[in-house]
C-alpha cells in the first residue's frame, strides 16, 4: 500500500519521491509544454549537479496565481513570474520574496527591466487617446505589460475589469472571468474550456500570444513587452508593418521603443517563500543551470528557450539570471511608481487626507503620537527601527514622510524619494530668529566637527588611529560618512573597526569593536541600536560618549554649545563647560569649539523631509500648516512643540527654527550638492547599506 501511494504521488509531481524533500526544489509549471520542458530541465540538471545537491521536480498547476498561492502554502518552492502577480495575490505580508531576476542585454551591462508598448498595425491611424471602442489583446489579467500598465494609463483610478470591459469593444484578456465579463474573453482563440485560459492552452496567452492576436488581425491594439516584438519579428521588414502608440498621442517605429512606451517595468523574477524557502538551494541550482545551459551554450537543452513553445519556465529573451539582494522584497522590486498605479487600480485612490509620519524607534513614536493627537487628523504615525527602514516603508506607501540626515537622504534619493522641505537652524543666523522670513531663508548647512577633551592634549586629527571614537550613527553625515570618508581617503581601507581601538557607532554589528563603547538602554537588545534607544545615539549621544568613555567624537558643530554651560540638565552634562572641549582641524591643529567655521571636517546640507513624488506637494502643505500651529511661533505652541523633545532631536533637530522651502533644490542631487555627492560616491564602497544596494539593483 505504501508503495502504491508513493507511486501515485510520483505521477502527480513528476518524480517527487525520487529525492529527499529537503533537497528537492519543487518547480511550478502551468501547462503541458512547461511540464515537458521542466522534465528536460530536471533530467539535464541530474547530469551536472554534484551528488547530494538539490534535485528538481515539476509540479503541475493551472495558473501562475495558483503557483504563487501554493509557494506560500509550502506545496511548491519556486516559479518565474511577473512580479505584479505576487502583489496581486494579496498574500500575508512578505510571505514571498524575489530571489533571482531575469536580465536582458549583455552580461557586462545587464538590464533588469523591459518596456511595455502599445502596438498597432501601420496605417490604422488612431492614437493612444483614441482607443475607446477598439479591440484589444492583453498578455493576461493581473500582468504588468498587458493589464496594470495599460489600465493605469488609459482608465480612471479604481477601475478594473468592469471599466476595461466597457472601454474596449471586445478583448482577449487571458485569466479573466469570461462568464462575468464576456467581452474580456470574446477575442480569445482557445477552444472550449481553453478559451481565455490562464496558460498557453489559450493561444493568445502571454506576451507572444497578445502579439499573435494583433498579427492575426483579431485586435486593433496589443499591449506587450518590447522584447517579445524583437523575438517574434527578427527582421526589420516584419517590424515595419507595425507602429507603437506613444504617450504624447503620436506614433513611432518599433525600433524607437525607448522614446515611445507606456512604462518601464522590472523583469520577470523567480520567487520563493521568505521563511524556509530554500533560497540558497534555488540560487545554487540556477547558477549551475546557467553555467551549463544558459544563453549561447551549445547544449541541446536551453534554459532560455524551448522547441515546445515560447517563454516556458523563463522568458526566451532573457540573457541570464541575477541574484536579487536580500533586502529586496516584492514591493521594493517593483518600485513605488508601479506600485502606486497598482494600488490605485486595485483599491481606488489612496486616502490623501493625512500624512503618515515615520518615527524611528519608540521615543520618536511617543512624540509622533502626541503630535497626531493634536493634529486634527492631519497626521498619523508609523514606526520603524532605523532610518533606512523608514525609507523603505515610505517607498512602499506604508509611510509618507520623515526627516533625514544627508547620508540617508543620499540613500532615499537613490530609492526614488524626493526632498520636500529642509530644516533651517537657529544657530546658522547670527542675528537670531528670522520669524516669518525663516521659510524662505537660505539653507546654509552645518559643519561636521571632530571634538576632543581639552585635557587630552596629545590628540590631533593625524593621531587618531588606535583611539576610542564616538559616532552619531552609521550612515549619518556628521558621525560616519564625512569622518570615515576622510579616513578612507588616507588609508584606502574600509576596515574602520581596525582603525579605532573601540567605538560606539550605533547601527553597527553589536558584537564588533564598533559597538564596544555603547551603553544601550533599558533593554539589552537596544545595545548599539540605530535610534534613540541607544544612549550614545545622535550628536548629543556622541558628546556624552566622549565625556564618559571616548577620546574623540564626531558631531554637528553646535552640539557642544547646546549641551554645556547649564543648557542640558541631564546628569552626564552637569558642570560641563564649552571650554572643556576643542575641535580637531585637518591640518593637525586644534581650536576652540566656537571656531568651527575655520576648523571643521566638512560643511554638509541640513536635514530634509523626504517623501514620494506623488505625495510631496501634499506633505509640504500639511507640514506648513502644522508648523503654523506647533512651530517656534505657532498659535498652539503651548499644546505641542514640533522642534522640542523629551530626548534629543526626536522627529526633527531640536535647533530647527522652521521647515524651509528648498529654493529650487527639488531633487536629491540638487539638494545635496556636487561636493557632498562626490564625497558619498567616493565613500560608497564602504557603505554597508543593504537598502542602497537594493535600490540600485535595477540599472535604468
Curated annotation (Swiss-Prot):
PANTHER family: INHIBITOR OF CARBONIC ANHYDRASE (PTHR11485:SF20), TRANSFERRIN (PTHR11485). This is Inhibitor of carbonic anhydrase. Residues 1-19 form the signal peptide. Changing residue 143 to R: Confers ability to bind ferric iron and carbonate. Keywords: Disulfide bond, Glycoprotein, Repeat, Secreted, Signal. It comes from the Eukaryota. It comes from Mus musculus (Mouse). Inhibitor for carbonic anhydrase 2 (CA2). Does not bind iron ions. Gene3D superfamilies: Periplasmic binding protein-like II. One of its GO terms (molecular function) is enzyme inhibitor activity. N-glycosylated. PROSITE patterns: TRANSFERRIN_LIKE_1 (PS00205), TRANSFERRIN_LIKE_3 (PS00207), TRANSFERRIN_LIKE_4 (PS51408).
